[in-house]
């Protein structure tokens, strides 16, 4: 084993001297045993010359002193992968943090892996059914695609993520991996307990590097989650769902260590390697001929500026965007997805078929017309509208309410049984509303129901 000594410590960045001819390679993991017996992992980032390397620590460097012995593991950070990690909570280096003993797996993967080769990629584009009406109809997710989930605090990002995990686990017997990147520890704790209660924990692996962790952990934890997902795709030929919350923090962590590593800052003070780092992560999230990794990434937009380099770089990789809107959440319509702001690359008649495409466009059209009329309604009231416009408003309000649906993971709050709605049922329901087949039903009949038949049944009880 190659042994070195700490020569300098600046925050999360540690310089280590090695004997001549024993320099670790870039990205090799080094370990330090602290005086109290705990282990600390460093990742090699730069060769500074004169047998010295600069590394980034994966945990706090408190208590380290110059001269401490450092061991080179001679390979990148390895994390446990396999069915044993399901139902467990790990940190960036793969150690369990759920207090339920160690994780014993027969295999480990490096967190730095190359993206699949071109000839291994699956080229067919197919829709990934989520069972959530508003998503399946208006911004369908693609299998192996990447979706950005935009939303402020308290509009339901976490509940939507949990419902997706639940639907994939129950309806499609799929596995999910959740990577909490620079998240609030409280939210991670809530997610863990809610998953235990809703019973989806056995189909999910959780990896956390939270806000209180040093930037090294936050910049690498997304890769840890991705490696676990890649195992299920490549070795078990499964379709896996990967949730990253929040992808902005991945970039933010990179920018925090960038200056300490001596790199010149780029636009807005971000690291010059921003596009490369994002590309290396996103290029691994793909479908191969064996299986797929479909990702949903929550994206924080600093100061609501979509041109900020961090969200702008993430945009380039996305296939679909789901925008959660506070104004819709205030109406009590959940999931609070904005049907006019959300987009999908695969909402194309050649991919989803004419029926789906035409219905989606008709829904958007009627909602847009309603939005245009809202100013007139606010000033003059409904009575001043033409009969044609009154009909548009009435149907649009029914469509708006029919876009809501009771969630399995929110049963405790709504008191309603969760609903998984198949795509053909979704299309049929919206087609009937727009065609005027249900003009005689009250709009409250469409609120928080699954299929159109349920709305008709509900109307009878009102």
Swiss-Prot record:
Origin: domain of life: Bacteria
Positions of ATP binding: 151-158
Pfam families: ATP-synt_ab, ATP-synt_ab_N, ATP-synt_VA_C
Keywords for the protein's UniProt record, in alphabetical order: ATP synthesis, ATP-binding, Cell inner membrane, Cell membrane, CF(1), Hydrogen ion transport, Ion transport, Membrane, Nucleotide-binding, Translocase, Transport
Presence of the UniProt keyword Cell inner membrane in the record: yes
InterPro entries: AAA+_ATPase (IPR003593), ATP-synt_VA_C (IPR055190), ATP_synth_F1_bsu (IPR005722), ATPase_a/bsu_AS (IPR020003), ATPase_alpha/beta_chains (IPR050053), ATPase_F1/V1/A1_a/bsu_N (IPR004100), ATPase_F1/V1/A1_a/bsu_N_sf (IPR036121), ATPase_F1/V1/A1_a/bsu_nucl-bd (IPR000194)
Primary location class: membrane
Subunit structure: F-type ATPases have 2 components, CF(1) - the catalytic core - and CF(0) - the membrane proton channel. CF(1) has five subunits: alpha(3), beta(3), gamma(1), delta(1), epsilon(1). CF(0) has four main subunits: a(1), b(1), b'(1) and c(9-12).
Similarity field: Belongs to the ATPase alpha/beta chains family.
Identification of the protein by name: ATP synthase subunit beta
Species this protein is from: Chlorobium phaeobacteroides (strain DSM 266 / SMG 266 / 2430)
Upper classification of the organism: Bacteria, Pseudomonadati, Chlorobiota, Chlorobiia, Chlorobiales
């Amino acid at each position: 084993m190659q042994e070195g000594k700490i020569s300098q410590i600046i925050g999360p960045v540690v310089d280590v001297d090695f004997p001549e001819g024993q320099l670790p390679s870039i990205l090799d993991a080094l370990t330090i045993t602290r005086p109290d017996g705990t282990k600390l992992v460093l990742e090699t980032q730069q060769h500074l010359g004169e047998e010295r390397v600069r590394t980034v620590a994966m945990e706090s460097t408190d208590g380290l002193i110059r001269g401490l012995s450092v061991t080179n593991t001679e390979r990148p950070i390895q994390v446990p992968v396999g069915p044993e990690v399901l139902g467990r909570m790990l940190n960036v280096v793969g150690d369990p943090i759920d207090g339920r003993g160690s994780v014993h797996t027969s295999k480990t993967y490096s967190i730095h892996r190359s993206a699949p080769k071109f000839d291994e990629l699956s080229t067919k584009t197919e829709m990934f059914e989520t069972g959530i009406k508003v998503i399946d109809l208006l911004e369908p997710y693609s299998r192996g695609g990447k979706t950005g989930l935009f939303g402020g605090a308290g509009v339901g990002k976490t509940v939507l993520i949990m419902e997706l995990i639940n639907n994939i686990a129950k309806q499609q017997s799929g596995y999910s991996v959740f990577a909490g990147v620079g998240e609030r520890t409280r939210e991670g704790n809530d997610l863990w307990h809610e998953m235990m209660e809703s019973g989806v924990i056995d189909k999910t692996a959780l990896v956390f590097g939270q806000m209180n962790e040093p930037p090294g952990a936050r910049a690498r934890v997304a890769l840890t989650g991705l490696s676990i997902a890649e195992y299920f795709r490549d070795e078990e030929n499964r379709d896996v769902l990967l949730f990253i919350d929040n992808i902005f923090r991945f970039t933010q962590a990179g920018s925090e260590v960038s200056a300490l590593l001596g790199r010149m800052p780029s636009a807005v003070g971000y690291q010059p390697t921003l596009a490369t780092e994002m590309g290396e992560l996103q290029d691994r999230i793909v479908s191969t001929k064996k299986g797929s990794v479909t990702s949903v990434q929550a994206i924080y937009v600093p100061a609501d500026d979509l041109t900020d380099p961090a969200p702008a770089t993430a945009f380039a990789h996305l296939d679909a965007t789901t925008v959660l809107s506070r104004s819709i959440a205030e109406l009590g319509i959940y999931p609070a997805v904005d049907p006019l702001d959300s987009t999908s690359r695969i909402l194309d008649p050649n991919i989803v078929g004419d029926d789906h495409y035409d219905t989606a466009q008709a829904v958007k059209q009627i909602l847009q017309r309603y939005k245009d009329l809202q100013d007139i309604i606010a000033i003059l009231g409904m009575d001043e509208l033409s009969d044609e416009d009154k009909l548009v408003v009435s149907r649009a309000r029914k469509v708006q309410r029919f876009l809501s649906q009771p969630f399995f993971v929110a049963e405790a709050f709504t008191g309603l049984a969760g609903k998984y709605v198949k795509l053909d049922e979704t299309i049929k329901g919206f087609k009937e509303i727009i065609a005027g087949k249900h003009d005689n039903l009250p709009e409250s009949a469409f609120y928080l129901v699954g299929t159109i038949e349920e709305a008709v049944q509900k109307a009878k009880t009102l």
